[in-house]
Amino acid sequence: VKTITKLRILYPIWTVISIFSLLYAPTLASESTLFKIGQLGQIIVQLFQIAIALLLYKLFMETDKEQASLIAIFGLLGVPFSLMAILIPDAIHLAEVFWGLWLIPIGTLVIKSGMFPKWIGYFLYIGSLGYFGATISFFLIGSVPAFVDYFTVGELIWVLWITFMGAKEIQN
């Protein structure tokens, strides 16, 4: 199965489980079973993250191996911090640094590859600012302003494009 097909399957599952485990399940701390399902969801999301980081490397390595390597490196480095956040919730802000970093080479390669509309790459850059803004806000003021989340919509646009539109074939 082609790399893009695998991404089209994994990305939406990753997104749905992420939304449930990061946004919804933590509000259910009083419902122990649902809370634990949310924690399990976070573990599953990180397993998907590993696969997606490696698939994105494979997808973009012909375009620019160095930038593709950065996708894999940053995508994988965020995993331990994300897992740590299951036990220490504030660790999520350390993971956000790597989430922001990984969107930069993805954005660069989206623009450079010709497989996707360039504007998506620019939205991914903006998304990286959202993650950096969340981390900086947390450490400087102790909370994350709600508007910072809107910056990360670029990542959602990327996931939706991959899922529904796929990638253009590049002729060598």
Predicted segments, located by residue:
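Hydrophobic, aromatic-enriched alpha-helical segments typical of multi-pass transmembrane helices
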Residues: V1-N172
